[in-house]
């Protein structure tokens, strides 16, 4: 990798979503509202799953981990983006930029692999219901979560080290609202061919493998549903999988648009809009997708609300 003698950047300036001052405050209010909804939705879902014993199953174990990743995923990006709306020049240090990129990649890859683990869980539940609790033991569930976290951390660490070993001397102005690969690579004066091949290989292998696991799992699930004689059984099986199918389609579709396209066709403005969708909107949507379309979660939420109301009435009567 060729290096050019130059003054290395010690900080970066994030351009943000817009240069129009009149849009910044409305966008700040909008994204702050979305972020608060994301935090409440995902943390609330985790607490609900932990509090209700009827939700202590492998399916909801994976869902609570997905909610945790969504919360972290959004929290890595959104607070800094909100600051960009309030300050004229949003400066981020070299080390903070590296940390943000590393954390972002860790949680993005974790989400992709967790969705694949959840697809396997759905496959076992629909295709082998009698063996479900035998196959999906606590040990297997922990492995299906630990492997994505471990792989994601190691891949993100290596990826971040490669990115920040490059020389940044052309400019320190990042045309994005967070530290991401494509905008950073446009600033470097180093040879980026190896880095771009690494991005393509990692994104391709990781996401294609994840998509294949999901695709194969759902092919077996669809065949199993079609073989069911009971219409009620087919409806229940489909309702079990529909939320996950929707979440998978939204997440992978956005990532394919972002990363699995030639670098020459990348438009940073289009990338910004796609990035908003999968770093801000998807973490907000997932709790809604999995809650509003899930009878067990809705019943557990009603139970919590009723119990709290009863406790409140009891305390009022004691007074």
UniProtKB/Swiss-Prot annotation:
SUPFAM superfamilies for the chain: Family A G protein-coupled receptor-like (SSF81321)
Bilayer topology annotation: Multi-pass membrane protein
Domain of life: Eukaryota
InterPro entries: GPCR_Rhodpsn, GPCR_Rhodpsn_7TM, Olfact_rcpt
One Pfam family linked to the record: 7tm_4
Cellular compartment(s): Cell membrane
Keywords of the record: Cell membrane, Disulfide bond, G-protein coupled receptor, Glycoprotein, Membrane, Olfaction, Receptor, Sensory transduction, Transducer, Transmembrane, Transmembrane helix
Disulphide bridges, residue numbers: 97-179
Extracellular domain ranges by topology: 1-28, 78-97, 144-204, 261-271
A molecular function (GO) term: G protein-coupled receptor activity
Topology feature Cytoplasmic, residues: 50-56, 119-122, 226-239, 293-319
GO cellular component: plasma membrane
Transmembrane spans: 29-49, 57-77, 98-118, 123-143, 205-225, 240-260, 272-292
Residues modified by glycosylation: 5
PROSITE patterns: G_PROTEIN_RECEP_F1_1, G_PROTEIN_RECEP_F1_2
Principal cellular location given in the protein's record: membrane
PANTHER family: OLFACTORY RECEPTOR
Family membership: Belongs to the G-protein coupled receptor 1 family.
Its biological purpose: Odorant receptor.
Protein name, per record: Olfactory receptor 8U8
Lineage of producing organism: Eukaryota, Metazoa, Chordata, Craniata, Vertebrata
